[in-house]
């Protein structure tokens, strides 16, 4: 605290209630009184750029791709559910041996993607062996996988395993031969 006291009858210093901007400025070349210090802003450091390591940046990119893949899988689940309800309204009850359609194969693949995040060539080959007796089901399976490969964005396609990237580069399968 200050040792000087402010007295209404005699001013021993500047009035503390006077705003700083209205106080009398110093004369050119004079110094402020010794007892008072000027408030100076603390020295600031120059702005530094933030450095992010390459591994951190690639990790963030992978996380963004994984999030994009999760959203894509969710969208595909919703779309295949709509297509399945549409397909059931068109199917006639005369079918004795139910066959897997393109939509049913897509639903199966999307469920597999949701659960394991992978569609591998070995899984595809196993599915082909199961439907190998029916040429129509084999075409439906190939068509469904090709459609999925083209529905999933290209930048996240490698995260789905080795099946879909290889199918995307191929020509579209023929539905009717």
UniProtKB/Swiss-Prot annotation:
It holds the Pfam family Paramyxo_NS_C. Belongs to the morbillivirus protein C family. Residues 1-38 are annotated as: Disordered. InterPro entries: Paramyxovir_NSC. It comes from the Viruses. The lineage of its organism: Viruses, Riboviria, Orthornavirae, Negarnaviricota, Haploviricotina. This is Protein C. It comes from Rinderpest virus (strain RBOK). Residues 1-10 have a biased composition (Polar residues).
């Amino acid at each position: 605290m200050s040792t000087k006291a402010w007295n209404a009858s005699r001013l021993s210093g500047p009035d503390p209630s006077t705003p700083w901007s209205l106080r009398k400025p110093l004369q050119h070349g004079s110094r402020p009184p010794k007892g008072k210090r000027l408030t100076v802003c603390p020295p600031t450091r120059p702005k530094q750029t933030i450095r992010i390591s390459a591994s951190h940046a690639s990790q963030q990119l992978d996380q963004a791709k994984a999030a994009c893949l999760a959203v894509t899988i969710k969208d595909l689940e919703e779309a295949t559910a709509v297509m399945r309800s549409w397909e059931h309204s068109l199917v006639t009850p005369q079918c004795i041996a139910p066959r897997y359609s393109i939509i049913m194969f897509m639903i199966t693949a999307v469920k597999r993607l949701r659960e394991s995040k992978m569609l591998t060539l070995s899984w595809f080959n196993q599915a082909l062996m199961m439907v190998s007796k029916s040429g129509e089901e084999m075409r439906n399976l190939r068509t469904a996988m090709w459609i999925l490969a083209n529905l999933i964005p290209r930048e996240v396609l490698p995260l789905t395993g080795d099946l879909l990237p290889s199918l995307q580069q191929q020509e579209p399968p023929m539905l009717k031969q």
